[in-house]
């Protein structure tokens, strides 16, 4: 969730590289979808479903270009093609609600690109604004036949970006009710509650997920308990739930399954937490423990800096 709501999510580059095999498989299936749509359209050029899925495939290519390849020109080239086709479909049949998903996403993205890139969007013909995008996405989320769930998921993320937490929370709870085995929706509820300032409720939700991971409930067993506890402790610490956070950091440290980086970072965070709790001598011991591990993301420098200030 935190990645999706970041201001630069649609344009910022990451260090992640898609494995070549997965990339080839994705593009192969996308091409297969386009080929099947074209076969149907050769027989009946007015087949609405074939028109929709062909245009939607270009929308997926656009999403792939901007999120994986970070190729803005390629994203707008495919996005414009999808947008134009689906806008025409909507004009002919306004109640073809699935088409509003791609249209809405495109409009929202165009409306949110940084000002210094807007000239490029204008030159290559991209048009759209944030509010139109949200309006069209809501239509798809309420009335779509094929993409209602996907549209609701997109709306949830974008409502969080817009700080419309009550609406985002309503969707997250609805999706969690329909897909109770998805740990993602349960975590989304906790994260939205945290961002909305409802810290006690957020904490309780994180604990609920922890119990399901601990009990190895279906699908929740895909999360490793020690890694989840570390992330949970960081969340709890950020909310000021210091006792609960301390307990989880110590469990990560004591867990033989925890990787060394998690242990080192737990000692570092625990030192910071103990300083907040006015227990400097214990904090010093935690910072010293950090130095017994390898240096992970500057952990040694951070620990030495705090030790210098505490002595």
Predicted regions and their residues:
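Residue-level recognition of tetratricopeptide repeat
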Residues: 47, 96, 147-148, 182, ...
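Register position in tetratricopeptide repeats
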Residues: 60, 109, 161, 195, ...
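"A position-specific structural signal for the A-helix of alpha-solenoid helical repeats
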Residues: 53, 60, 102, 154, ...
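Amphipathic alpha-helical segments of tetratricopeptide repeats
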Residues: 84, 91, 135, 141-142, ...
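Short coil/linker segments at helix-helix boundaries
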Residues: 1-46, 53-95, 102-146, 150-157, ...
């Amino acid at each position: 969730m935190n990645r999706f709501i970041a201001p630069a999510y649609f344009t910022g580059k990451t260090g992640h590289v898609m494995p070549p095999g997965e990339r080839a498989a994705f593009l192969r299936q996308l091409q297969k979808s386009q080929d099947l749509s074209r076969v149907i359209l050769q027989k009946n050029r007015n087949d609405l479903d074939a028109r929709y899925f062909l245009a939607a495939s270009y929308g997926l290519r656009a999403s792939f270009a901007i999120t994986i390849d970070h190729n803005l020109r390629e994203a707008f080239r495919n996005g414009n093609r999808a947008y134009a086709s689906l806008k025409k479909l909507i004009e002919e049949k306004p109640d073809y609600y699935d088409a509003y998903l791609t249209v809405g996403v495109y409009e929202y993205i165009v409306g949110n690109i940084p000002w210094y890139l807007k000239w490029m969007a204008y030159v290559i013909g991209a048009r759209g604004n944030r509010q139109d995008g949200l309006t069209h996405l809501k239509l798809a989320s309420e009335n779509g036949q094929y993409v209602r769930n996907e549209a609701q998921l997109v709306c949830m993320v974008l409502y969080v970006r817009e700080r419309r937490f009550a609406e985002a929370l309503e969707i997250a709870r609805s999706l969690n009710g329909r897909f109770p085995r998805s740990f993602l929706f349960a975590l989304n509820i906790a994260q939205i509650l945290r961002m909305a300032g409802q810290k006690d409720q957020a904490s309780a939700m994180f604990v609920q997920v922890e119990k399901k991971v601990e009990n190895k409930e279906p699908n929740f067993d895909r999360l490793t308990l020690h890694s989840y506890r570390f992330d949970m402790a960081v969340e709890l610490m950020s909310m000021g739930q210091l006792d609960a956070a301390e307990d989880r950091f110590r469990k990560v440290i004591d867990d033989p399954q925890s990787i060394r980086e998690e242990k080192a970072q737990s000692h570092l965070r625990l030192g910071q937490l103990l300083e907040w709790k006015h227990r400097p001598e214990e904090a010093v011991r935690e910072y010293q423990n950090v130095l017994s591990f390898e240096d992970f993301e500057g952990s040694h420098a951070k620990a030495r800096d705090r030790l210098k200030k505490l002595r």
